[in-house]
Amino acid sequence: MIKKNWMYWLFFLALFLAPFYLTEFRLSLLGKFLCFAMIAIGISLIWGYTGILSLGHGVYFGLGAYCMAMYLKLEASGGRLPDFMEWSGVNKLPWFWKPFEQPVIAISSAIIVPVLLAMFLSYFTFRNRIKGVYFSLLSQAIVVVFVTLFIGKQEWTGGTNGLTNFSTVFGFSLSSPLTQIVLYLLTVVLLLSMFLFSRWLTRSRFGRVLVAIRDSENRVRFLGFNPTTYKVFVYSLSAAFAGIAGAMFVLQVGLISPAMMGIIPSIEMVLWVAVGGRSSLIGAIIGAIVTNGAKSFFSENYPDIWLLFLGGLFIAVVLFLPNGLTGVYQSVRQRKKQGEVRANEASSHVLQRVSRF
């Protein structure tokens, strides 16, 4: 297995060694991109393998991020009310904030809250056989609801500014280079774990059923399987990945706001997977890193046109790269193999003719 997939291991080894060859700023940037790659793996599972196009995964990312940010904000406040609550005239910490004084609850909630929402949403939609563009529109409607709620309840969520100004995590300074390296390495470990688990899942019997659902859901139902169960599970799993990504994002970037969980970020998440190749887990990771790396480059050097670049990239992928970057790579490998086979056939044919003489 190691021999066959040596490129995967080399890729993750390069990620592990990044603290030795990247500056502190670039390492922080890469850590953020790897958080996005976690989301991309989940979207690849539901879109590439199961045929569920979700345009609302920003919500699950945001919920995971807010759960972690609530703990960080309370820790930074040092027993006092968070500053935005004081500015809004709140005199007492809301009851749903109190559990987040405990880090264990904050970490577990970053996974449980997105999963519960995903299970609730997916069960009722998939049970009623809502799919395709209708599910995509419904997922975007959920985004609008949550963004509006988070902006409107400023005294609870910080409004449009979100939650910021975190100083420590578990007593360690977030500005410390050592803390940032530890958080980065933890992100790599989590990403690798998600990749390996998803790879095992897609190659199992469960994964084959997911692909069958994507290709012909009615036939799967006719064979005695319940597609709703499979779709709810994989959709909830992708929400868990997004929630974990949100929690790690907050720890490394130091802020979260409703704008980061809105419609545009949710669509961008799908774009990452499309660029890398929606039916490839490693392609989803590469797509997230490449797209966000290019976005960072253009926003730094050409701030006036980076949105045009993003739109142009999406159009180019749809028109010319329907299978993404990994599709191009696989196509090149396939042609190379075919060329080798033809060359071998030609050489053997020549040898046969020579042997006759």
Task: Give the predicted meaning of each segment.
Residues M1-F357:
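Transmembrane alpha-helices and adjacent helix-loop boundaries
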